[in-house]
Amino acid sequence: IAWLYLDYLLGPVKWSENKKWAALTHETDGFLYVKPLSFMNNSGQVVQKILNYYKLLPKNFGLLLKKESDLTNELIVIHDDLDIPFGKYKTASDSSSAGHRGVQSIINYLKTKNFYRFRLGIANDLLRNQIPPEKFVLQKFNKEEKEKLNEIFSQISIKI
């Protein structure tokens, strides 16, 4: 869902493949937009490499930190959330992954929960009860769902 949002936000732009980071990137107006090419469960590794490159992690990163790093002004993560009804969203920072493996990977690699997140609801009770979660999240959106997503994307863009 994050890829769809970035396509909505940026329109047709040229994405550069960075093999070192395992990501597609686009930089504009001082912002770096990233589409990880890794499995979702390994998103943290991609994010860590990028933040290290831009020196946004503490110098003693990797050691046990006395205080967690606060990345709320440096990192925004957009992800799907099966616990939120389709077409709704919530924001979060300094909170647990709530079982989302991609978010947990980021928390594990960065050793902090202090980053900003947009949790985009994809829950559909009719389908969800029939399809295992790991397959449900890979389903394509239909035309009506895509229209609803564009409404949500517009709301999120205002907040970002």
Stretch-by-stretch model annotation:
Residues 90-96, 136-141:
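Short glycine-enriched, charge-decorated loop/helix-capping segments at active-site entrances
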